[in-house]
Amino acid sequence: MTGKSVKDVDRYQAVLANLLLEEDNKFCADCQSKGPRWASWNIGVFICIRCAGIHRNLGVHISRVKSVNLDQWTQEQIQCMQEMGNGKANRLYEAYLPETFRRPQIDPAVEGFIRDKYEKKKYMDRSLDINVLRKEKDDKWKRGNEPAPEKKMEPVVFEKVKMPQKKEDAQLPRKSSPKSAAPVMDLLGLDAPVACSIANSKTSNALEKDLDLLASVPSPSSVSRKAVGSMPTAGSAGSVPENLNLFPEPGSKSEETGKKQLSKDSILSLYGSQTPQMPAQAMFMAPAQMAYPTAYPSFPGVTPPNSIMGGMVPPPVGMVAQPGASGMLTPMAMPAGYMGGMQASMMGVPNGMMTTQQAGYMASMAAMPQTVYGVQPAQQLQWNLTQMTQQMAGMNFYGANGMMNYGQSMGGGNGQAANQTLSPQMWK
């Protein structure tokens, strides 16, 4: 009888689904792959799709394959699957399978194993009768598998252990409740109302004492006056007591401004001591006494007034060459105000000498009109800048040999004329 009705088909599908939920039927009977969706109903095993193809190659007389979901099942086919299953089938066909045997995973090896198992019956236990095995119920298999769930059904011990814990938890709040009530009453202070009045009187007395203490403290103005009066007036502007005076009086501001001005003047005086200011009329005047050598008898000694040069640093004396007999220049004392106040160190050389082209060159430079060094103290002496630039234009302060020359080294003036001008090569 074929299940043509829809109700029978649904009922058969439900039976197959229940069979697949069994532990042995969750894996392929041949390769042990998970989730078999095919079955050989005459053998009564669930297999995977790869093993189903090999079973079809064995022939219908050995194995008949059907899909669990796609094909229609009959009552006879469902009955065969219920009687066998993967557990009983492996007990029959793999009875003599070695314990160290590894199930193959490659298709040719799997096909050889399936043929040995079902076609050649190489591992089959021939002493067992298939019909008796089919009619045998699965009580033995269920009893062998049931001890595991029975062991899992022992959580009663844990419940007994949890019960005393609950009792202890219930006793804890009961014991803690009377303890929590006592501090609440003490905090409110309802039992001792008299103590509150006493405390209030004590606090009022304490406040009165505090007010008396504040009244006895002197005012900040009086403290500041005492501090200002005790401080010395000649103190520095950045002293600590003045910085601590947080309430200065208006009269002290004028004193502070006067001190600040004095401090500024003292700072400026430091710079003034290094660079003293000279009057314009005394810039080009000669020092107190200046002696000229015998070669220039026309220049007498000039004695300027002491009021002009008084209190100033003595001017440095440099060396100026004096023409001699052999073309060399002899040293001559030169004032600091000479040539517009130029320092004599500007004219200085390592040997204190200067070379010239000819002995008579410096004669014109040294022979200046007597009006420059006038004897009258009140006369304002000024230097003629045009003569200054003309005479200084021919000077070369940095020669090739580190000496000051006029276009020629020392001893080289014999071959040049007296009125020869400077060499143009020196100004390149």
Curated annotation (Swiss-Prot):
The modification Phosphoserine is found at S127, S219, S224, S230, S239. Residues 252-262 have a biased composition (Basic and acidic residues). One of its GO terms (molecular function) is GTPase activator activity. This is Stromal membrane-associated protein 2. The gene is Smap2. Residues 163-231 are annotated as: Interaction with clathrin heavy chains. Interacts with ARF1. Interacts with PICALM and clathrin heavy chains. GTPase activating protein that acts on ARF1. Can also activate ARF6 (in vitro). May play a role in clathrin-dependent retrograde transport from early endosomes to the trans-Golgi network. Keywords: Cytoplasm, GTPase activation, Metal-binding, Phosphoprotein, Zinc, Zinc-finger. Residues 218-262 are annotated as: Disordered. It holds the Pfam family ArfGap. It is found in: Cytoplasm. SMART domains: ArfGap. InterPro entries: ARF_GTPase-activating (IPR051718), ARFGAP/RecO (IPR037278), ArfGAP_dom (IPR001164), ArfGAP_dom_sf (IPR038508). Residues 13-139 form the Arf-GAP domain. A zinc finger (C4-type) spans 28-51. The keyword Zinc-finger applies. Gene3D superfamilies: Arf GTPase activating protein. One of its GO terms (cellular component) is cytosol. Residues 339-428 are annotated as: Interaction with PICALM. It comes from Mus musculus (Mouse).
